[in-house]
Amino acid sequence: MPIYNRIADFHEDLVATRRDIHAHPELGFEEHRTSDLVAQQLESWGIEVHRNIATTGVVGVLKGSGNSKRSIGLRADMDALPMDEEGTPEHRSKNAGKMHACGHDGHTTMLLGAARYLAETKNFDGTVHFIFQPAEEGGGGGRVMVEEGLFDKFECDTVWGMHNSPNLPAGTLAIRPGPLMAAVDMAKITINAQGCHAAQPHMGKDPIAVGVQLYT
């Protein structure tokens, strides 16, 4: 996939940003340093910045060169995972028990790169919302942003996101019609049991047996 010359011009800046974020991973709703970095870069390119959505979420707003009412959202996640990083690269995690093992450092950097390019060229008609989401790793950060009025404040006709895939060659995009890599719903099930003596299991209701049947 060809890379526009202007983006290639600031490739090294993107590498430095990704490595900086990778070296300073933060868990869900704790992405204070990361959100500071994101906001500072967006503001330096003249992008309108809104902060503290779902605690550490950031939204940048950029209007294009025309008067179109159309608007889209471009979204990336910022949080890391609670695990230690092993290895020797200079940009390995400096925060014990925290690591960007799922590539959100790359996602954040890619969205910053898109924001910089669009801010410099404004070669589009409409409005782009750059949505930097906290707490994707099980924290429900996207849901919290919506509950706090994300789309009431920043109306989007469509929202686009992407996820890295190390098993594909560099420069390759994989896509299909409809949703891709969408999250599943979560449910909580309570099994009410009845205790009994170990020698009289037939007098009780064993939650383990019920749980196994439910699972299988």
Language-model-detected regions and their locations in the chain:
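Histidine/acidic-residue-rich, glycine-tolerant segments that coordinate divalent metal ions
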Residues: 59, 81-83, 87-99, 106, ...
